[in-house]
Each structure stands twice: as structure tokens, then as C-alpha cells.
């Protein structure tokens, strides 16, 4: 199976070089020993004078065929297709007439026994490699979606992809599926907004109100109301974080433990109540405008909102129940349990900060990167656990035998030292005293730097790619929204002009009558 000289024979194949694919490195995939003569039997380079110009002999028809893909010609023996009978090229051998051949390829030259396929010749290079050597690779410069279409066209299953390429291929397909799903949701919202403007006046007014509410709540860049709503939401989140920090001051905590409430404590409670009221109103507005209530309640950001809002109301109920059960001379066990529950619930208010992900592209990128890099984070955790399990017992034995250090009392205590040392934090609460212990500490520091650098590079590239995708998607949504508004305004102007025209005509008719 070789490239024939002739038309497009000077095609630049440097872009299709497999040297840019890191999966060919022996560390990733050990190469099998080549069988001498196999490639010569499966594909043979033809000289210029050997190219069939007027016709070919009958024995050549039975022995070899010519494949023309996008102007690039390949010659291969029929025996090569015996191993792939279910592929599109393998089906050529089962064709018995001209109509069967045209059902498989785009055209056929009887004189030269040449089959034409109007496909991308660059993508066919990987198909050629698979038919020739049995290795299916996805080049880094090739689009995964185009490659998927080529596999479907040539009848080659995705399972033939090597492990390294298949993982990257499935990741690209998954990212594209997520992007298509988000675009379909936006299209559904836009179509619902267009359908809501029906002929009935009441339905049209309700639909317009819902569309404006959706733009204000879910689309900050849709207009001034959306920007104001987003700014208010961010402001209340900031006020909540500051109010939570102020409520932990020692003076306020002492008053709370003693059962007293000063003016400052009362002000903190009022600020918290106002913020929770705003968050509750925002949650209700999002619930009202959601097309699918079940999908809205199932989303991660909605769950975060519920976990952050409910503790306030639960605290009020628990305080009321505790006040009802408080009796003179009764034990404090119940009140202690109630106080513990209240402290845990109040600590959950810090989840309000996660609400900023609705309005921050950076936080959305961080969440998307964490979801896409679960494997890298797992590798990082595995590296750290193995290194910690190695250095902690070693330092414990050295320090207890040679320095009798009081800090390293047990191996679990040394685990804490190993974590702090390998992450290069270095609190200084546990310091090795002996020279061998300091050598172990140095080895731990260097190992931590190297081990954390390996997955971080991949995570950084994923973060950059995710940020670029979300930014392009946001720009695309804004552009589509602007086009939709322009189209809507033009339709309204046309309808108003028609109403004026036909309205004047109908009035003239009434006057004549």
C-alpha cells in the first residue's frame, strides 16, 4: 500500500509525521520486532513508469487495486484486505457489479481498476497505517471529531485505537459532548423565549416576563438588570463572609456562651438575616424560571445553595426548641448537644463563597479542571502517599535511635512531618536533630518537589485549555444572544409596519362602507 507518483505527489506529509506523538515513545508502548519482508508484500512503492496509464493487465486486477483518496493514489494487494472484510475497503472484494462498487466508493475507473473516494487524504494516512501495520493512532494535530467521522466512514471500530490514543480520543469526544449539551440548553432557552411570544396577549406577556427573569438571573451579560443582579449577589456573598468572620470574635463568643446578646451581636444577626433573605429570594427566582425543576434541583450549585441556606432556618428551629425545653435545674447535656449542632451548622455558612462560581469564569474553570483531571490528582495523591509511607518510618527510627528527639513520638506523628516537608510548607514544629535525619529531610523535600511537578504540568495545560474553551463559549453565547435580539427587533418592526398598513386599509374600507 504505497503512494503513487502523479497528481498531488508533492503533498507535504510533514504535518502527518508520527514523531510528534509522544505515545510512540518506548516508555509508553514497547515496539514489536518488525517482520522482514512483510511491508514489501503488503505495500510496494511503484516507479513512475509502472503507474498504469492506459489500462492494466487482468492478472494485475486480480492481484492489486489502486485507491484514490482526495487525489492521492495508493496501491495495495487484495490480500491486505482479507484481514479487514468488514471495512469499506474490504467490501470492495465482495462487489460483483458496477452498482455494488458505486455503493462503496464515489467513482470507479474500469481501465485502470482505480477506486475514487472523496475523503480527506490527510486523515486516510492513519487508516493506511492501520491497514498496513495493524496500529491505529490519533495524531495530536488531528481533530478528534473529524477522526471519528473517518473511522465511521471507513468502517473501523474505535476499539482498535491504542490505549494512549484512545484515552485522549475519548477525552476530546467527552469535552465536545459537554459543549454541545450546553449549547442545546441555551438553544432550548432561546427557543422557549421565542415560542412564549404567542398570539395570545396574556401568554405573550407571561412569556416575556419569564424570559426577562431568566436573562436577569442566569445571564449577567444580557443587559443592565442582569449585571445589577449579579453585582448584588456578589455583594451579599462578600458581606456574609465578613459577617461570619466578625461573629467569631472572642467577645461575641463569650456573650453567646453566657446567654447574653449585646448590640453588636444583635447587629450581626440582623445582617445575617438580610443576607439569607436575599439568598432565599434568589433561590426562588432561579427555581421559578428553570424550565426543568428536577434538573435545577439536581445541579451542584443548587445543592450548594441549599446547604448554605438551610442551616440558618434550622438554627432558628433548634433555638426555639431549646428555649422551650430549658427548665430551671435541668441538666446541660441537651443544651450542649444543641450548641454543638448550631456550631456545625454555622460553619457551613462558609459555603456561601462557592456561590461566586455562578459569576466567576475562573472558578468555573477551576471546577471543570478538577473534573477533567481526576486521574492526575489521583496520581499526585498516590505519589505523596508512597513517599510519606517511605520517609516517615525512616525518620522515626533515625531520630529515636540517634537523637532521642521528643517531637517524633510515633510513626503517625512523623506522617504529619512528612506531609509538611514534602509540600515545602515547613511549619518548624517538628525538626530533625541528627545528621542522618537531616539528610532524610533533604531527600523528602527534593522528592516532594519532583513528585508534585510531574502531574502539575498536565493539570496546568488542562486548566489553560478549559479556560479558553469557557471563554470562547461565553463569547459565542453573547454573540448568539445579540443576533437573537437583533432578529427579534426586526420582526417586531416588520409586524408593526404591517399592522399600520393593514390597519389603515381596514379603516378606509369601513369609511367606504
UniProtKB/Swiss-Prot annotation:
Region annotated Disordered, chain positions:
184-204
Topology versus the membrane: Multi-pass membrane protein
State which tissues express it. Answer: Expressed in brain and placenta, and at much lower levels in kidney and pancreas.
Which portions of the chain have biased composition (kind: Basic and acidic residues)?
Answer: 191-204
Q: Which InterPro entries match?
A: BTB/POZ_dom (IPR000210), Ion_trans_dom (IPR005821), K_chnl_volt-dep_Kv (IPR003968), K_chnl_volt-dep_Kv6 (IPR003969), SKP1/BTB/POZ_sf (IPR011333), T1-type_BTB (IPR003131), VG_K_chnl (IPR028325), Volt_channel_dom_sf (IPR027359)
Which residues are on the Extracellular side of the membrane?
A: 247-267, 322-338, 397-411, 432-438
Q: Name one GO biological process term.
A: potassium ion transport
For this UniProt record, the keywords arranged alphabetically read as follows: Cell membrane, Ion channel, Ion transport, Membrane, Potassium, Potassium channel, Potassium transport, Transmembrane, Transmembrane helix, Transport, Voltage-gated channel
Q: Which residues lie within the membrane without crossing it?
A: 412-423, 424-431
Q: Where in the cell is it found?
A: Cell membrane
Q: Transmembrane segments in this chain: where?
A: 225-246, 268-289, 301-321, 339-359, 375-396, 439-467
Q: Which Pfam families match?
A: BTB_2 (PF02214), Ion_trans (PF00520)
What stretch of residues is annotated with the motif Selectivity filter?
A: 424-429
Superkingdom of the organism of origin: Eukaryota
Question: What molecular function terms (GO) are annotated for this protein?
Answer: potassium channel regulator activity; voltage-gated potassium channel activity
Q: What is the protein's quaternary organization?
A: Heterotetramer with KCNB1. Heterotetramer with KCNB2.
| Domain writeup | The transmembrane segment S4 functions as a voltage-sensor and is characterized by a series of positively charged amino acids at every third position. Channel opening and closing is effected by a conformation change that affects the position and orientation of the voltage-sensor paddle formed by S3 and S4 within the membrane. A transmembrane electric field that is positive inside would push the positively charged S4 segment outwards, thereby opening the pore, while a field that is negative inside would pull the S4 segment inwards and close the pore.
Q: Which protein family is it in?
A: Belongs to the potassium channel family. G (TC 1.A.1.2) subfamily. Kv6.1/KCNG1 sub-subfamily.
* Role description: Regulatory alpha-subunit of the voltage-gated potassium (Kv) channel which, when coassembled with KCNB1 or KCNB2, can modulate their expression and their gating kinetics by acting on deactivation upon repolarization and inactivation during maintained depolarization. Potassium channel subunit that does not form functional channels by itself.
Descriptive protein name = Voltage-gated potassium channel regulatory subunit KCNG1
Provide the organism lineage as a comma list. Eukaryota, Metazoa, Chordata, Craniata, Vertebrata
Which gene name does the record give?
KCNG1
Amino acid at each position: 500500500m504505497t503512494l503513487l507518483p502523479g497528481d498531488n505527489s508533492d503533498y507535504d506529509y510533514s504535518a502527518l509525521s508520527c514523531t510528534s506523538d509522544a505515545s510512540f515513545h518506548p516508555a509508553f508502548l514497547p515496539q514489536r520486532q518488525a517482520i522482514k519482508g512483510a511491508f514489501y508484500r503488503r505495500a510496494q512503492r511503484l516507479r513512475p513508469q509502472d503507474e498504469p496509464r492506459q489500462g492494466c493487465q487482468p492478472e494485475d486486477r486480480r492481484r492489486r487495486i489502486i485507491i484514490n483518496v482526495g487525489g492521492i493514489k495508493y496501491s495495495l494487494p487484495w490480500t491486505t484486505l482479507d484481514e479487514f472484510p468488514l471495512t469499506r475497503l474490504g467490501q470492495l472484494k465482495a462487489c460483483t457489479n458496477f452498482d455494488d462498487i458505486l455503493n462503496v466508493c464515489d467513482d470507479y475507473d474500469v481501465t485502470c481498476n482505480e477506486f475514487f473516494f472523496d475523503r480527506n487524504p490527510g486523515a486516510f494516512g492513519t487508516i493506511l497505517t492501520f491497514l498496513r501495520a495493524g496500529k491505529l493512532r490519533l495524531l495530536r494535530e488531528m481533530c478528534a471529531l473529524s477522526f471519528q467521522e473517518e473511522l465511521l466512514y471507513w468502517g473501523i471500530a474505535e476499539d482498535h485505537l491504542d490505549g494512549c490514543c484512545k484515552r485522549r480520543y475519548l477525552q476530546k469526544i467527552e469535552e465536545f459532548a459537554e459543549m454541545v449539551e450546553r449549547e442545546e440548553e441555551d438553544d432550548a432557552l432561546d427557543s422557549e423565549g421565542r415560542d412564549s411570544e404567542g398570539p395570545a396577549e396574556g401568554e405573550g406577556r407571561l412569556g416575556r416576563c419569564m424570559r426577562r427573569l431568566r436573562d436577569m438571573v442566569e445571564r449577567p451579560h444580557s443587559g443592565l438588570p442582569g449585571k445589577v443582579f449579579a453585582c448584588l449577589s456578589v455583594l451579599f456573598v462578600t458581606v456574609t463572609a465578613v459577617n461570619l468572620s466578625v461573629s467569631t470574635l472572642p467577645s461575641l463568643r463569650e456573650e453567646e456562651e453566657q446567654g447574653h446578646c449585646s448590640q453588636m451581636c444583635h447587629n450581626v444577626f440582623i445582617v445575617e438575616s438580610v443576607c439569607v433573605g436575599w439568598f432565599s429570594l434568589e433561590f426562588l427566582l432561579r427555581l421559578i424560571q428553570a424550565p426543568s425543576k428536577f434538573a435545577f434541583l439536581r445541579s451542584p450549585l443548587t445543592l450548594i445553595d441549599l446547604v448554605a441556606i438551610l442551616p440558618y432556618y434550622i438554627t432558628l428551629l433548634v433555638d426555639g426548641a431549646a428555649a422551650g425545653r430549658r427548665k430551671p435545674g435541668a441538666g446541660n447535656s441537651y443544651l450542649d448537644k444543641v450548641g454543638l449542632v448550631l456550631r456545625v451548622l454555622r460553619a457551613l455558612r462558609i459555603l456561601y463563597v462557592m456561590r461566586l462560581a455562578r459569576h466567576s469564569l475562573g472558578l468555573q474553570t477551576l471546577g471543570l479542571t478538577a473534573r477533567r483531571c481526576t486521574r492526575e490528582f489521583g496520581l499526585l495523591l498516590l505519589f505523596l502517599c508512597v513517599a510519606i509511607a517511605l520517609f516517615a518510618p525512616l525518620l522515626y527510627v533515625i531520630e529515636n535511635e540517634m537523637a532521642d528527639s521528643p517531637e517524633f513520638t510515633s510513626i503517625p506523628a512523623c506522617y504529619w512531618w512528612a506531609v509538611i516537608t514534602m509540600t515545602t510548607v515547613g511549619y518548624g514544629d517538628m525538626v530533625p536533630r541528627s545528621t542522618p535525619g537531616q539528610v532524610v529531610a533533604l531527600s523528602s523535600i527534593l522528592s516532594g518537589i519532583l513528585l508534585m511537578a510531574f502531574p502539575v504540568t498536565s493539570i496546568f495545560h488542562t486548566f489553560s485549555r478549559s479556560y479558553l474553551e469557557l471563554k470562547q463559549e461565553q463569547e459565542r453565547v453573547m454573540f448568539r444572544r445579540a443576533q437573537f435580539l437583533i432578529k427579534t427587533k426586526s420582526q417586531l418592526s416588520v409586524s408593526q409596519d404591517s399592522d399600520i398598513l393593514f390597519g389603515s386599509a381596514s379603516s378606509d374600507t369601513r369609511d367606504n362602507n
